[in-house]
Amino acid sequence: MGLSSNSAVRVEWIAAVTFAAGTAALGYLAYKKFYAKENRTKAMVNLQIQKDNPKVVHAFDMEDLGDKAVYCRCWRSKKFPFCDGAHIKHNEETGDNVGPLIIKKKET
């Protein structure tokens, strides 16, 4: 009688652990499918600039820059690739600390 009751308890525990593991796996898969995709776009830096290109690249000759050039690094500028100060609003909204890239001639 003692042996069969231990077997019944083991079967119940195995069933409970299997159910819990299955529930956890389904929860994880649901999280990955729905929640992670929603947050992926929020983590993107470039939300609107040349989205049809696989990689956004701008190149300038140093001689063409003049004395100073200020480039956007927050991807929010309406004058991209040049900075228009949009990082100020971006920093206030997100708590970020991004600023422009400033390239200027060395003062002699």
UniProtKB/Swiss-Prot annotation:
One of its GO terms (cellular component) is mitochondrion. [2Fe-2S] cluster binds at C72, C74, C83, H87. Its cofactor is [2Fe-2S] cluster; pyridoxal 5'-phosphate. There is a cross-link at K42, K55, K68, K78, K79, K89, K104, K105, K106 (Glycyl lysine isopeptide (Lys-Gly) (interchain with G-Cter in ubiquitin)). The active site is at K55. One of its GO terms (biological process) is protein maturation. It comes from the Eukaryota. The keyword Disulfide bond does not apply. Ubiquitinated by PRKN during mitophagy, leading to its degradation and enhancement of mitophagy. Deubiquitinated by USP30. Its EC number is 2.6.1.3. GO terms for molecular function: 2 iron, 2 sulfur cluster binding; iron ion binding; L-cysteine transaminase activity; protein homodimerization activity; pyridoxal phosphate binding. It is a single-pass type III membrane protein. It is found in: Mitochondrion outer membrane. InterPro entries: CISD1/2 (IPR045131), FeS-contain_CDGSH-typ (IPR018967), FeS-contain_mitoNEET_N (IPR019610), MitoNEET_CISD (IPR042216). It catalyses: L-cysteine + 2-oxoglutarate = 2-oxo-3-sulfanylpropanoate + L-glutamate. The chain crosses the membrane at residues 14-31. Liver, adipose, skeletal muscle and heart (at protein level). Widely expressed. Expressed at the highest levels in the heart. Residues 32-108 are cytoplasmic. PANTHER family: CDGSH IRON-SULFUR DOMAIN-CONTAINING PROTEIN 1. Belongs to the CISD protein family. L-cysteine transaminase that catalyzes the reversible transfer of the amino group from L-cysteine to the alpha-keto acid 2-oxoglutarate to respectively form 2-oxo-3-sulfanylpropanoate and L-glutamate. The catalytic cycle occurs in the presence of pyridoxal 5'-phosphate (PLP) cofactor that facilitates transamination by initially forming an internal aldimine with the epsilon-amino group of active site Lys-55 residue on the enzyme (PLP-enzyme aldimine), subsequently displaced by formation of an external aldimine with the substrate amino group (PLP-L-cysteine aldimine). Homodimer. This is CDGSH iron-sulfur domain-containing protein 1. The lineage of its organism: Eukaryota, Metazoa, Chordata, Craniata, Vertebrata. The gene is Cisd1.
